[in-house]
Amino acid sequence: MNRNAMVGGAVILVALALLVFSLYSPNQTPVAETGLRPLTFVTDWKAQAEHGGFYQAVANGYYADAGLDVTIRQGGPGINVPQLLAVGSVDFGMGSNSFIPLNIVAANAGAKAVMASFQKDPQVLITHPRDDVNSLEDMRGMPIMVSDATISAFWVWLRSRFGFTDDQIRKYTFNLAPFLVDESAIQQGYLSSEPYSIEKEAGFTPQVFLLADHGYPGYATFILANNSMIDAEPEIVQAFVNATIKGWVSYLYGDPSPANALIMADNPDMTADVIAQAIVKLNDYGIAMSGDAETLGLGAMTEERWKTFFDVMSASGVYETDLDWHAAYTLDFVNKGYGLDLKAELTSE
């Protein structure tokens, strides 16, 4: 999984969307055989457990119950989610992290986040087992392997929060070999990807530091919709959001096997063991259900969190300070406690 390559939204060619957003026209023609509204949702990478809630909503019929016939289209190399939204090729898209909606605003491309599946961005720093590194603060001054995209993304926060400096940067090419042969190495990773790969390949459990647990304020795994759909068909957006929330709650706290079967069918390279360990980590680290989501419901977002993220990034020059960051999201479709009753039902003894 190479979603780390997309951590900095600069790799998304949102400027192209400026030319074509006016082409969007809501498709209100139902599928004749089902009477359901057809919708296409494109993800940010190949099918995996981190997309499980969406697949569960398909497999368990939650989208159908909401009057929707949803097709999930896998992302991957060369798949530009904002551009697909812009030309109307898809109805909804997945945004990997908080940079994506803000970059869309910076490009004046007319789309926003309507839900954040993950309260915690699963970005991590990884070390070998060692006594001298027990926190992110301990890494100050040490060489760290990060991707080019990361330098203008969460590395900005590490500099601001922990005093990291650019002379610590070493290039990460998504090859584990340099890390495995150097016991002093530190590298970036994705919570459910590199740590498990290291365990399988090298036979040891690395130390994993989830940035979100050290204050990193970004959300992850957004649902993106263009403003035309939000304005013209808010009821469709709400139906998609609610069914997705239900899918995530069912996937994380119920039986995930219906979604897992679809995930492995879409992505033959995915295996049951990788999915299983990812689900455990999503739950153990509270990736989807923690913080505001515990009271407001899965998918929650708040103005305070968005402001904190934007303030750090704009102060460091990632964005102009006068960018209308409020335009990156809407709270109209979340924070209603939807799905909390299902979670209580599934987790009750």
Region locations from a protein language model:
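Short, low-complexity disordered leader/linker segments with a strong preference
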Residues: 1-37, 340-349
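Secondary-structure end/capping motifs
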Residues: 233-318
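Short, glycine-/small- and polar/acidic-enriched structural segments
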Residues: 2, 8, 33-172, 176-181, ...
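Conserved C-terminal helix/tail region of periplasmic/extracytoplasmic solute-binding proteins
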Residues: 306-349
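Pocket-lining segment of extracytoplasmic ligand-binding domains
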Residues: 99, 131, 174-271
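Short linear loop/turn motifs
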Residues: 71, 79, 212-213, 276-284, ...
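Short helix-capping segments at alpha-helix termini
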Residues: 62-65, 162-164, 201-203, 269-270, ...
